Structure formats: structure tokens, C-alpha cells
Amino acid sequence: MKKILLIGGTSLIGQHVIETAKSKIDCPPRDIIDLKNFSTIADYDYNGYDCLIFVAGAGMRHGRDITFEKMDKEYIKDTIDVNCSGATFLLQKYLHHNPKSVVVVIGSGAVYKTSTPNVVYTASKVYLDRMIDILENTYQDTFFIRVNPSKVNSRFEHVDWYIDPKAVAKGVWHCIENNIKKLDISYPKDK
């Protein structure tokens, strides 16, 4: 990889992807690419990238666990705007300029759950995961990689069995270096 575009570099996983990178990484701040602002997505120059690593997301900040009934309209809109609408438009723009590249999407182990209190977050991650299925058939020269970690340690105290963001970053690079299309990372079954 010569030039990588990272979306979500301020997340814990994104920070560890940057720390462990062996290639040049461009990580535009939110004022340059804001997934809730289509004009910033449209205005970015996507030319010349070998790889997109998409780790941005909304709706599960630091273990947020809210029921469907308690979700307010701002939470719902923010989660869908970032995880679905913004992600879709960004992928459209990126793939238009780089149809023969690598696209890594760090999603969520929640895509496998059929029972969860966080309906909106989980549904948005299922949308993103399914969209990658469809894009793989459309962009056959693009190598798509999905990394779906279960609960990631996101500044929780006294929770040693959540997945370390460093391990997820290591998994991302392992998939890229070894042409692995999918990696599910989960915590021990007895937890």
C-alpha cells in the first residue's frame, strides 16, 4: 500500500490503525470530511488512493446501551446519517475514483445479533455489511475486507474481557497483508 485514506481516525481503533501503519495515511478531520455533510464528502479529492479504511461510526459511543423506546430523534438521525447515508455517499465517491483498490470496513459483531436493545445502531451496521455484499458484485476489481469486532474496549473501567482496539487494528493490517476478506473478532464465549 502506498497511500491510504482513513475515515474515523479519532476513534480508538482508528488511532491504533494510524500508530501501526507502514504506509502513508491521510486522515481528514471532520471539518474536511463530515459524514453528516454531503458537500464535504463531495468536495474531497479521492484520486490516487490504494486503500480506504472506514472505521467511522455513530451510535455506540463508549458502550452506550439504550433501548429502542428511549432513543430520541437526534440519536436516530445521527446514527443513520453517519452509518448509512454518509458511508454510502463516501463509498460511492471513493469507488468512482479508485475502482481497483482495497476497501476495509470495520463494522460490528452486532451484524450477527437478532436480539439487541440498540436496534438503530445494529440495523445501521447490518445495512453497511449488506451494502458491502452488493458492492462486491458491482466492483469486482475492488478487494473488500470486513472486520467485525464484538464489544471493543472503549474506555470502560474494570472490563478486561472486551476486545482491545489495538487487536482490531492488528487484525485490519493482517487482513490487508494476507488478502483476507473477512475477520470476525469476538471475546471468549464464557464471558
Task: Give the location of each predicted region.
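Rossmann-fold scaffold of SDR-type NAD(P)-dependent oxidoreductases
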Residues: I7, Y49-G59, N83, V105
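C-terminal helical subdomain
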Residues: R146-V147, H158-K191
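N-terminal Rossmann NAD(P)H-binding glycine-rich loop of SDR-like oxidoreductase domains
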Residues: I7-E19
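Conserved mid-core segment of classical short-chain dehydrogenase/reductases
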Residues: G57-K77, P117
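Flexible, glycine-rich beta-alpha linker
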Residues: Y112-T116, N137-I163
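Hydrophobic positions on the long internal alpha-helix
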Residues: G86-Y94, M131-I132, C175
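Catalytic Tyr-X3-Lys loop
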Residues: E69-F89, L128
